[in-house]
């Protein structure tokens, strides 16, 4: 083990400036320009030959693996199919349009030709070919694609040109009805897509297609109509600094999320007073809102209006929205994050959705009682709570040992964050804010109570809370902002609990009526409800027909200005240009149009035609079944949910498939596409949609990370008071960094055993029936939402879908049988032709090959071939395990992984991306669990896992996190991680082969004669844990130095600091992890915290044990800086503070007694004398004189002087004699090789120092001098030998381990 550890520095060395920069310069950059297959102008085919790097199959497969494959295939084939629709259309105006488009293309080509001939009279054929190359490589492909693009764009415009007029209200006989208020609310009337142009031969076809696309959008995008009431923050009448402590907070005191406030209503607001403020008062609006939405002593809640056909509608008055904010919003899964200011509002909507659909039986938000009889309400009061220590908390700022439980009520307020002024007045309006930091209104820890803060809650009336209180534990907390009545239950409640008997009678189809979610935003507080959510999310499912009905109902209400309630008005852009629906339809337009037409064409057969893309297959069979028999019903015999929804949106006599019988040529063209491409298009559609969903999940995670990082930075910068009322979001994060309770809104869980339809069979946001146990039926016990990590399952799903696409693409490529063909003599793309030599297929091949050859994956394959095609690399690289093999290299594998894992993890923008770690871990144990290496027995595996700490539930080691980061780099299709990994291994092999001769040569080049070079470790730690970061940064003295012995337990160089400089976030649980973060070391500033060498601190002890065959007491050196060279050409990245200490403070005569090591770069007196005697340059002698003057304070000023004649005062020979005499008289202590701690003064390694500045350490570098003369001793014997000559290797081992 001792020998293998010495490979670590060599691996590390390649990441230093010298190890990587110099080696790559020596190897030269890889020039891939001459590797790309292309055809030269002599028609000699040089691409895709037998001896070329890649084959056509590889390029085509790369192109087909991405969305571009679907778009290219359909661009050509669907474009050609549309020609038949235009040519054979009953509307002769449509056929005329085709003729006009064809003529336009010819005109455009003539103009292009004229432009090129005029601009390049001689080279115009070359320039013209460049244009052709972008459109398939020939004149015919250029014209065809130009026409196809025009037809597709025109077809899309025809579809949507009349969509607004086609949405109409109809009666039971499918007859038009005016959109009056009564007609809209009548249960006998339905909203349909109808043909508003009965004389148009294509009118019915367009209406059908509109209905289908709208249905597909509803199923896939899950559009949610929202009703909102917005209450903008407003500063108190005496200013924000009358509430918050301006002196403590400083310039960060700005009205907003961190420092929210509302102006007290009726305070100088009365008409006739000189202080009248015409601005609407948000607090007054909030009070009016509560009184209207939660009236006391009434059987029902008028917050929701119930028509005879629709329930759960929210009609909130426009006046409740401050500053004219809209009271109706439309969000989908694709725009949810961008629809709000702050991710907290978006997550609150997701929680509300999950709460209504019943997928988790609960919510992450507590229900809070509001008192509609209370006057002078502060809109912030609903977020404040108080409780005893028995209540779990989401923050560990107090270091209280309180475990997370399922009844977590909120975020425990840290008084260090909240600086609120105390008032001498009895201002009950602000009393809860003043409680947060203690004082007049109640101490923050009075009577054993603590104050808590919610980011979002669910508002409910006292009636609902009274109904819910039976059987619930009311001791968990108290809402300090509600009524003066009894305590309210501050835990998430099952929906069935929040009902009065009358409400249950009103709506029999659901377990409860919705209570609005109330959340804090950046600019104010928001009350939000999913309009009609109880209607279309009833019975634990999403009813697509009812969801579409609500959307269209609200759309016609807004369009006709026929609103149900007085004071309620809104607009809703549902179908017009620029709407979310049309934006979605125009993204991947060709695929959506083709998929819709194919599904419609097959609908008349009773089953959906398979192979459509962009969601038809995903949307299939998401209907919620309540019995096991129905769950098992084959999707092959079920109509697509999209088709069923589309039919419900059309007149009863409508037939989606009928228009195709009127144009059999068009139908045949679509059928031909299906016949050839259905398997690939279906697989590619699933992959595309899943990747889109993953993108939304990733975006949500990143938004939460960015939000948390903002607060972490404030803590790191000792600006806690700027955090104010900032808090974590209430949604728990899993150990892998995912937020499962939120992410299932985008990617439903694959859990058929629980009654959920698999994600591959469902619409993206559809959640379905859940099994209800007897215990759940009879109790109000709250269950914490499942926080099972999602990343691994998502990765598996992505790999599965990707593999499926690759398989289908391979079959397609085999069918094509593509081979190179000679194209234009001026073409710069490789032309391919298929076996059948069809023009459309050849056009597809040309487009795919041009795209594929530029794809990152293909580009990387060229680079990787540069390594894998060399015999030396192939013979020493295991391509299956992706690691080195062979006696000379295989022992490096663990250290290679360790190095790369840590490097990848350190490069993460957010170190919390994959969760927290508890310890360093073991490479072998980590690799054994992942199958990367084999251990001899199951016992060995168990022991390895135990030693790494991986058996602890919820804990991860640093190397486990590093492995995740490393693998994500390798697997990213848009990165060149795999190539860089091979380059790293190749560089390592080049460095260490043949006794590391290249490694030694590079070191000798870097450490020139007389150059000072050090290797060093830098760490710091705070013994008292009381210093502020700002004060610590001002300290530069070395304090309380640890003893350099193996037995010194507090040796900072052997101590693994788990969270230095807040690298894994602050002590506050800003990410709301189940496993809370560890306390940060806010004083450590080393940039190489996790770089280390596995060696004992005392080399002598290790050497003695090795020589006797004993085991070594190996320890990790943390905070490793690597090799630092004092040279203008140095490529060292060492910090300025480090170089100042080791090169300026050390190495020159500071005091008369401070001599040790001043000339250590010359090894000894004899070496320096020999260098002077062998010098033939006068300038070099003068330089030696300057070195001696600076290092030992010898007066050498006359060496460089000249007499009046311009001749040197001292001759060359006399200079040399003078310098040799000076050196000969020097004390040997000047040549001591320095090892020790360096602060403002030099101290030996075993010394300890103290300072009047206290006991806090900011920097503690331990340099180790590495003279050039030691380099030649490296690798004098093989690493594999069991014994070695100690006199040769004592210094070598130190040098080897120092180069990270």
Swiss-Prot record:
One Pfam family here: DUF3713
GO CC entries: plasma membrane
UniProt-listed InterPro entries: DUF3713 (IPR022186)
Cellular localisation: Cell membrane
Family stated for the protein in its record: Belongs to the MG307/MG309/MG338 family.
Primary site of residence: membrane
Keywords: Cell membrane, Lipoprotein, Membrane, Palmitate, Signal
Renumbered residue ranges of the record's region Disordered: 464-487, 620-639, 774-797, 1244-1269
UniProt feature, compositional bias: Basic and acidic residues: 785-797
Name under which the protein is recorded: Uncharacterized lipoprotein MG338 homolog
Keyword Zinc in annotation: no
Membrane-topology descriptor: Lipid-anchor
Compositional bias per record (Low complexity), positions renumbered to this chain: 464-478
Signal peptide residue numbers: 1-26
Basic residues bias locations: 1257-1269
Lipidation (S-diacylglycerol cysteine): 27
